[in-house]
A protein has these predicted regions:
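Catalytic cores of carbohydrate-active enzymes across secretory and cytosolic contexts
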Residues: 1-422
Length: 422
């Protein structure tokens, strides 16, 4: 496995498993297949020797401060991320960032070439490493190489804006198989590369979760949480990275309209800090926190805000309690490759209680047909879905639960690996 990050974070005295959808999805796959993981440790200017963690051999790639600024914050997240999410904010095109992106991709490819066994299968993950397959193909032609893009792939017209589009497509042309979350993403890719013998095979492989790893909150913990927020008539929940693609502000404004209608509801909004040195992310946080304060000022009372906002990460156990306690889960991104939060929430409601409000532009909407779909660009659409979710039919949640249970992360990985080996 080759990914931008190793599946661990540095803590005092050692390492702990990282939060996040990619890590949650891939770690069980590697353990089951005795694989290894090549990636950055998360520590800047700190060379780390290979080590074993939780049954997985990890091979760290060192990044310095300039790598982090230009490769990660720059080209990956200020150029590719906004471009691939339909220009919600304008991408920045910087030649120095591009050179750094290429240099870091070369480093990842070399590290992988050194540790991969003869004839091994290498699975490269996501937009930060799109050059690795082509570089690795030159270094190790014996390898079988797959690539999976976890975020959307843009339309040809948008992609052609990128000054280095030919180099990125050349990197993906080194693959035996390129995987996408949605058929629409694969169609966009095929429109660029064509269907001749020189282009890689491609397919659609919607990622999922490991339902067995989701920690459902106990009835006692759920009751305690609901009591702590005033036992509202309806408890709604948002769980997101603090990212401009997630539509958090528009969700808050729709919730404000719901309160104006006199609905007895409380919202818990968890917003994990993300990419805080990038201006668009800082501005998103400012707007969200301003809205939280204003809405609480209008509708809250002493000791009982209507929005409980936390700008921090939470443990799996805490998150499971939030999921289990929520009557309505709000997942309203402007654009999202999949969104595993939606599936984690469903996995916490096997008995049919709860309801899911889901953006039609999230990849999860392709599978979770029984969610209350909304257009996150239209406040009235979010509000309408919220209203409908307050009177949900339990059968809708049961059907979604069966879908998540039947198509878990192990099946996702097995299908991709079976196809790449074909």
């Amino acid at each position: 496995m080759v990914a931008n990050r190793l599946p661990v974070d540095r803590v005092e005295g050692g390492w702990k498993a990282s939060p996040g959808g990619l890590v949650a999805a891939l770690a069980p796959v590697l353990r089951a297949r005795a694989g290894c993981w090549v990636g950055w440790s998360g520590a800047v200017d700190e060379p780390v020797a290979p080590f074993r963690f939780d049954g997985i051999d990890l091979y760290p790639v060192t990044l310095d401060a300039q790598d982090y600024e230009e490769f990660y914050e720059g080209f990956s997240n200020s150029t590719l991320w906004p471009l691939y999410h339909d220009l919600i904010v304008a991408p920045q095109y910087n030649e120095q960032w591009w050179q750094r992106y290429r240099d870091v991709n070369v480093r990842f490819a070399r590290a992988t070439a050194e540790v991969a066994a003869q004839g091994a299968t290498v699975w490269v993950q996501d937009y930060q490493l799109q050059l690795v397959p082509g570089l690795l193909r030159e270094m190790r032609p014996d390898l079988t190489i797959g690539f999976f893009l976890h975020i959307p792939f843009p339309s040809p017209d948008l992609f052609r804006q990128l000054p280095w589009r030919e180099e990125l497509i050349g990197g993906l042309n080194g693959c035996d198989l390129v995987g996408f979350q949605r058929e629409a993403d694969e169609r966009n890719f095929r429109a660029l590369v064509g269907d001749d013998n020189n282009s890689p095979r491609s397919g659609t492989f919607p990622i999922s979760i490991d339902p067995a790893a989701v920690q459902v909150g106990s009835p006692e913990a759920v009751a305690k949480l609901r009591e702590s927020v005033g036992n509202p008539g309806a408890l709604m929940l948002g769980v997101d990275r603090m990212d401009y693609t997630k539509g958090i502000l528009q969700r808050l404004l729709a919730f404000e309209q719901l309160l104006e209608e006199g609905v007895d509801a409380t919202l818990i909004q968890l917003a994990t800090p993300s990419r805080e040195r990038i201006e668009h992310y800082r501005e998103t946080r400012r707007q969200v926190e301003e809205a939280v304060g204003r809405i609480n000022g209008r509708f809250g009372s002493v000791g009982r805000p209507v929005i409980h906002y936390m700008h921090r990460g939470v443990s799996k156990q805490e998150l499971g309690t939030f999921y289990a306690a929520a009557d309505v889960m709000l997942v309203t991104p402007f654009k999202d490759g999949m969104n595993l939060v939606a599936k984690e929430y469903v996995a916490c409601h096997p008995d049919g209680d709860g309801a899911l409000v889901l953006s039609e532009f999230a990849g999860a909407a392709v599978e979770l047909h029984d969610a209350y779909l909304c257009n996150p660009f239209e406040g009235a659409s979010i509000l309408r879905a919220m209203r409908e979710a307050l009177d949900s039919d339990p059968e809708r949640m049961r059907r979604m639960y069966a879908r998540v249970l039947g198509h878990d992360v192990h099946r996702w990985a097995a299908e991709f690996l079976q196809e790449v080996a074909r």
